[in-house]
Amino acid sequence: SKKNFLSSNEYQPLLVLDVDHDNNLKINNAVLSEEGLVGRVTNLGFLSAEVMLVQDVRSSIPIISSESSLHASLKGMGLGRKGELNFIKKTASFREGEKLYTSGLGDVFPQGLLVGEIVSISDPVDSEFLKIEVSFFSSPINQDYFLIHAK
């Protein structure tokens, strides 16, 4: 699908894609680029599909890590920003450089779609959780074409 519009709202960016009117698309279909997961379809029009991006602050993606096989929830923090893994206990064995994939839990995204990579892990003294930052592999800013994964 071709990009029609990308809003400038940093925290709740909206991507609109042109689609054929005789498509079999559904709400929550995954949207992909060559680099990995971009987001999910949140609204369908006659010739368009609205996409909530993985960077959206309302986005929460169930992931699994490539090396430690740990599950977590990846939260968007805004377009152009890193995402964060939420509520990770300090005993967890995530590693910097680990790639993160969709886990398939929740039945929104299929299992195994590449999402991002852990770029930093810190241990704040004022929290019982680790602060884990994730770099998203895919951004819609410099791309014009996307694939909508129909279930």
Q: Model-found features: residue ranges?
A:
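A secondary-structure micro-motif
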Residues: 1-151
